[in-house]
Design a protein with these regions (language model features):
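Short, glycine-/small-residue-rich phosphate/pyrophosphate-handling segment
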Residues: 1-23, 27-38, 182-212
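Glycine-rich phosphate/diphosphate-binding loop of Rossmann-like nucleotide-binding domains
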Residues: 7, 49-115
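Short phosphate-binding/catalytic loops that engage adenosine nucleotides
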Residues: 14, 90-91, 179
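Short, ordered loop/turn segments at secondary-structure junctions
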Residues: 20-23, 97-100, 140-141, 188-189, ...
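Short amphipathic alpha-helices and their capping/turn segments at secondary-structure boundaries
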Residues: 35-52, 84, 116-135
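Gly/Ser/Thr-rich active-site loops/lids in small-molecule metabolic enzymes
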Residues: 70-84, 153-173, 207-211, 240-254
């Protein structure tokens, strides 16, 4: 009976939110998901809602059958941006690598892929199938990957040498596959002063013709007394971002204008 009622409501144009089956029953979705989906429905008719693709999390590549190399990223920033943009009515597609956290509600369009080559292939596919109007590159992509050894490298060896090869840069390939779009990059550095950080962000904008770059330092991420990040646009204007909530709001304002 419930299925028939839900089907009838859907056919009449109602938006029905159904949770996954748990313990043999379909229970009420969490309040967080209900609010998120309602916000998306309410805001999707606002002007300048966009199709947005975002990469997030870290890459991982094998050293041997049991060991691997990865970049530092929990995925917190990428998930937070994705959730915020979805609630604001945008159509969001996430390409997620390895993350320590998951979104607070089920985002409708998520692909998980951890290896840098596979992530790039997925992003290129999405460039044609989803045709993003905006790309946000927040993933910590491996710049180098090892040539994996067959089996397990013996732990009795006193030292090992690992040969690493450079990976293909994701941003130019993805933007070339997408065509005209608004693009935001991320630049994470460590033990560097602000002037040098902004110089590196500016170089990234010039190299890839990005519209803006979010620059931050590893040592600032968990320091409540430090800014969360700085944003630099293609005109050279920079500004401080106090926290993650502000970061999400600033990105949305750039996209929606």
């Amino acid at each position: 009976v419930t299925s028939e009622i839900l089907s009838q409501l859907s056919s009449e144009g109602s938006h029905v939110i159904i949770d996954h089956e748990k313990e043999g029953k379909i229970k009420q979705p969490s309040h967080i998901r209900i609010v998120a989906e309602f916000s998306n429905i309410l805001n999707c008719d606002l002007p300048n809602r966009k199709r947005i693709a975002i990469t997030l999390g870290s890459n991982i590549a094998p050293i041997d059958d049991v060991r691997s190399i990865t970049n530092h990223s929990t995925g917190t920033t990428g998930w937070s941006i994705s959730e915020y943009l979805y609630r604001m009515g945008h159509d969001v597609f996430c390409i997620a690598g390895r993350t320590q956290y998951y979104p607070n509600f089920n985002l409708p369009k998520v692909k998980y892929t951890e290896h840098p080559i596979e992530m790039l292939e997925e992003a290129v596919n999405i460039s044609s199938s989803f045709t993003p109007e905006v790309w946000i590159f927040s993933a910590a992509v491996l710049d180098y990957v090892p040539k994996p050894s067959e089996g397990k490298i013996p732990s009795t060896k006193e030292e090992i040498q690992i040969k690493m090869d450079p990976t293909q840069k994701h941003i130019p390939v993805i933007l070339n596959a997408t065509g005209q779009c608004y693009s935001i990059g991320f630049k994470l550095e460590s033990n560097i002063d602000l002037e040098k950080l902004l110089e590196k962000a500016s170089s990234q904008i010039s190299r890839y013709s990005l519209d803006a770059v979010i620059a931050n330092r590893l040592e600032d991420l968990n320091n409540p007394e430090s800014p969360r990040a700085w944003i630099l646009d293609s005109t050279g204007k920079s500004s401080e971002i106090s926290d993650l909530t502000s970061l999400c709001g600033i990105i949305e304002s750039l996209i929606a204008n």
